[in-house]
């Protein structure tokens, strides 16, 4: 790895630790030439499947879109960023575990609802009302009744 200070090509690893629940390695490095120290983070580059939309179009998986949907659902609710990140990690792991090159957007929506129902019931109803396109109060009532069972 090149030194970010002097661009020397030789650096040595001083310390390595697992971070992010074992999904990343944090390394402290020292340049052999200028002796400056710096930190690097190493993680596996995992390919996510493409998303098949309801209209049949295909697009790359967009983690920020997934995160944005979850953040809107849990807005002003007692859910920590750690809980959100764990839920997103579970969704992504499940998608990768399918082994498929493409997944339907419906599957992603259902995985999101599975995570939200465990995080916060109000957030689940918020997301479901948009995702399932509730049109009247009775549909909200049905969704709430399912939660209470």
UniProtKB/Swiss-Prot annotation:
Cofactor(s) needed by this chain: Zn(2+)
Domain ATP-cone intervals: 49-139
Gene Ontology BP terms: negative regulation of DNA-templated transcription
GO molecular function, one term: ATP binding
Free-text remark on how the cofactor is bound: Binds 1 zinc ion.
Domain of life: Bacteria
Keyword Transferase tagged: no
Described purpose of this protein according to its UniProt entry: Negatively regulates transcription of bacterial ribonucleotide reductase nrd genes and operons by binding to NrdR-boxes.
Family assignment from sequence similarity: Belongs to the NrdR family.
Protein name per its UniProtKB record: Transcriptional repressor NrdR
Taxonomic lineage from the root: Bacteria, Pseudomonadati, Pseudomonadota, Gammaproteobacteria, Alteromonadales
Gene transcribed to yield this protein: nrdR
